[in-house]
Amino acid sequence: MTKPFLLEIGLEEMPAHVVMPSIQQLEKRVRDFLEEQHLEFGQLKTYATPRRLAILIEDLADKQADIHEEAKGPAKKIALDAEGNWSKAAQGFVRGQGLTTDDITFKELKGVEYVYVEKSIIGKPVEAILPELKAVIMAMTFPTRMHWADYDFEYIRPIHWIIALLDDEVIDFSILNVTTGRTTQGHRFLGQEVTLAKATDYEAALEAQFVIADEAKRQNLIQTQIEKMAQENDWQVDLDANLLEEVTNLVEWPTAFYGQFDAKYLEIPEEVLITSMKDNQRYFYARSQAGDLLPVFIGVRNGNDAFMENVIAGNEKVLTARLEDADFFYHEDQKVTIAENVAKLQNVSFHDKIGSLAEKMTRVGLIAQFLGQKFGLSEAELVDLQRASDIYKFDLVTGMVGEFAELQGVMGEKYALLQGETPAVATAVREHYMPISAEGALPATKVGAVLAIADKFDSMADFFAVGMIPSGSNDPYALRRQAYGIVRILENQDWHFPMADFQAAMSHIVKQQADFDLDWSANAAAISDFLTDRVRQRFNGMRPKVRRDIVDAVLKNQGQDPVVMFEAAKVLSAHQDDADFKATIEAITRVLRLAEKVDFETTDLTVDPALFENDAEKALYTAVEDLRGATATNTLAENYAALQTLRPLIEAYFDATMVMAEDEAVRRNRLTQLMIIAQIALSLGDLNELIVK
């Protein structure tokens, strides 16, 4: 027999961004609990609003499944003493199983007889198990927690009521001073308290009290209302998924409305208007069919349409105040030159242990020029890069960015253009922040990409130099994200730069020309390892997924060049299912293991054919020499193809040749031959890491 079960946790209003993660966590914890308790169940239906987290479990079994299992004990020779009596080992075993020696049987396993017992565990009724959900509720974790009254217990928000209803029966337990019941709360202003007769009444009963508990249903309603509004007014509305989810989790009874603002504010850059509407007020914005931003906003009220004119007027007043501030800052900022703003940066601290923003910009300018030349930027691009690096943080001291921090870079681009900077320079000022999120958009221009890498590397090296290295989940300055951004930009631009060389070159430049008492060389190895970890992170995010052993292999690429690593992984992944992949890798790894035994200088790898003692050596030598000239300019795909070609010759070579010959000259000659092949293989990484079956 099965019954529905409802669990609802009633809370004070939660922040919108934790509602969905919280209900997902609760669902997983409840599901795991039911499975651990051997309780069969049907569908789990979740409900979530700012004031409640709830789960309706359909077809919950009325008792645990009975468990019949067999337990293996000691070997028979240990279970019985010399007189055939039960030993202490046997008696202790059955006592631990809750049985007696009368329950023992013997079974043979791999030629040895062992003690076995069979035991049955009769399932408990579900009513006896469900009170343990108290521990599930209390074990939940949240990004921020609070305590209330005099309780030591902390939760996302104070708990005000709990429903635990098995069909029509309340399951009793308490958390702090809150005891389970069958009563829930309707909308804070429109609804009333409602008592449920049975669990399945939940959704309909709440809807009658102005609460749409189903998050998907609430979101669909908002979307439908806004789309209807847009159609009636011939608007285009960007229903941003993140904003839609946030608004959905701010309300229990959504009613969309629209208001207007003075068209004079359209003179302000639209990014400012959109930020004011979307990020600050949680409004959707609208465009004309021609794509022009319109002086209207769309909001969602947590309530019905009563007195909507007052709601609209209030929202218009709040937005107008924000836009008036923005208009003021926009015009006041233009009275200050870029040079004046840059001068102010000498008094703006980047970090008290590192120095000012002006000092950071000096370092970044040097790094950017070095990188720009390394990556082949044109003379004109290098000129733009120099100018961009001289000014790129100037907007941080403007009034607009002081009020709307999320517009840093965006306003820098706008103001730079207004003051006569070239489009390339202005764009780089904006792009140097990119990617803003881990998988966000990348700089589209080379100048912006170089400046972004230089700025991010400087930040990373600065904090490492003063010992502020990320550990565990502690990364207050987002250095992992910035390093990951470097890796993604290098990949996107196909720019080659070995990480160890990168660090050494940067340290030298800064030490010589912009020291500012920062020792970048102290943590050079740590920075290289940190970047390598971000390359691994990039691999983990790739689809189709790259095999872990392939990742391990290419991360040991001698040059530590991220772009080469990505290409090597692509090549190995393309061949991992080849019929000869196993044989090729086994042959090459044998070469690599012997090459590791080389104990002499390998800068001049010259093989002497006069020392060959068999035809297999000659055949391999001829094939390698034919390939050797091309491998320096080969692609990695061509290098792998060369290894495939050499594979049968390598196998024949090992069949006929003792590499570690007693004669030193012969041994060195053979190891040199293998070192040449090893160098081709090492261009792909350390193939010893590959697992082939």
From Swiss-Prot:
It holds the Pfam family DALR_1. Its main location: cytoplasm. GO terms for cellular component: cytosol. Its EC number is 6.1.1.14. It is found in: Cytoplasm. GO terms for biological process: arginyl-tRNA aminoacylation; glycyl-tRNA aminoacylation. InterPro entries: DALR_anticod-bd, Gly-tRNA-synth_bsu, Gly-tRNA-synth_heterodimer. One of its GO terms (molecular function) is ATP binding. Keywords: Aminoacyl-tRNA synthetase, ATP-binding, Cytoplasm, Ligase, Nucleotide-binding, Protein biosynthesis. SUPFAM superfamilies: HD-domain/PDEase-like (SSF109604). It catalyses: tRNA(Gly) + glycine + ATP = glycyl-tRNA(Gly) + AMP + diphosphate. Tetramer of two alpha and two beta subunits. Belongs to the class-II aminoacyl-tRNA synthetase family. This is Glycine--tRNA ligase beta subunit. It comes from Latilactobacillus sakei subsp. sakei (strain 23K) (Lactobacillus sakei subsp. sakei).
